[in-house]
Each structure stands twice: as C-alpha cells, then as structure tokens.
Amino acid sequence: MTKPNYDALNVGDAIPSFTTEPVSRLTLALYATGSGDHHPLHLDQDYVRAKGIPDVFAHGMLGMAYLGRLLTQWVPQAAIRSFGVRFTAITQVGERLVCTGKVVEKLEQAGEKCVRLELTCANEQGEAKHKADAVVALA
C-alpha cells in the first residue's frame, strides 16, 4: 500500500469511500462470533419484540469496524495515531452503510506530518449511524 502524499492533500479532500453489502442477520451472527458480543438485541428476534423493538439491529462496534476498514484501505494501520467514534443512530437489518471521510486539517504532531479526518458511516439515505475523527501520519 502506498501512503497518500501529505503535500498533495488539501483540507476538504475526500478519501476513497466504500459501501457495505446490506447488513444481514448472518452479518450480525458472524460479527457476534468474532467479537464475542452475543447480546440478544443483535441476534434474538423474539427477545427484541418482547421489548417492543421491531427487529434486531447491528452492534455499534460493527460500524466502528467499518470505519476502521475505511482508514486501513487508505493508510497502513501503523499510520493511525488516533481514532475516536461516536454512535449516533441504530443500524437496521437490511441497510447498506456508506463510509466516507475527508481531510479537515493538516498538522504536524510529534515531528510527523499528519492529517485529521472526519469520517462518517451513514445509510444510503444519508442518516449518520457513526461519526468519527482520526489522525493519521503521512510522513
């Protein structure tokens, strides 16, 4: 992987985005197995209906994982200096998630040329599910 060029980047530039496949019950089961989070809110339709919730929904950390993937498709994991995520809405079964990011600041940190990014994971209707910020070192 070739890191983006710090000098060629400008505030406002977008990083390459991606769209997930629809979140399915299989996605949730596989994520539960990998993460160890088997909470019935994400897996048991009878449980959630008894709570007055129409259907199971995605783990919040699944969206964070997708935003991590957005970053590591752009820079090596070792270049990530900080990564913080806020969960803003529930991801429903069947939704495709669109992960996007843009440069909001160029800075020098601990002698490294870095960029600060704003990242968003939203459904196809534009409803943000997760918002994040990250700092990555480029030189």
Spans of features found by a protein language model:
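Catalytic strand-loop segment that frames the active site of acyl-thioester-processing enzymes
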Residues: 1-56, 138
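Short, intrinsically disordered, mixed-charge
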Residues: 33-36, 72-76, 124
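A broadly tuned preference for mixed-charge, low-complexity surface segments
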Residues: 43, 66-72, 118-123
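Hydrophobic beta-strand-centered segment that forms part of the acyl-chain substrate-binding groove
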Residues: 49-58, 62-103
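HotDog/MaoC-like acyl-thioester-processing domains
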Residues: 1-15, 90-139
